[in-house]
């Protein structure tokens, strides 16, 4: 597997820490560890008492239990913790797709959403966001993109880079669409809070 160079990361490597004004990053405003711990009284004791060894491969049980509370109908044993989006995308493609498969990816988008699959030999079709529609993608176009080889639909909500966020109704229709066509749905929700509270 030979992925294409990650253009955004190459750009950041050159400019992220030297630009006078950085307007192209999605990082939140940073804070110190003491500022973070101040959100929960007594948490410094918990941090200082934390064990730094290996944990179970799906992630620390306490973390998985806490993550499960964020989603309706998801048990903690159905959660696998990753170190970031790159690892999760790679794991999904490696485990769920084969070189003869086809994936539909909401575009424009985060490069890894399509380039990792392409590096594995998966054929990728763009499901294009339309500026004139507020960056929503056309549902009829999605239907037309499905082939007998299609195995996955990849979306990002809120969408990167446009910021489009589907209504609950639209999101539910996308969720229902995937199993109706025998597809895995990979929904990258790296930016769900606070903007996605309505879902």
Residue ranges of model-derived segments:
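N-terminal small-domain helix-loop-helix segment of the aminotransferase-like
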Residues: 1-84, 91
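Short acidic capping loops at alpha-helix termini that bridge into adjacent secondary structure
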Residues: 75-79, 100-102, 149
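Aromatic/hydrophobic pocket-lining residues that form π-stacking "cages" and hydrophobic walls in ligand
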Residues: 91, 113, 174
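A short helix->loop->beta-strand "cap" motif at the edges of active sites that frequently abuts
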Residues: 101, 122, 180-183
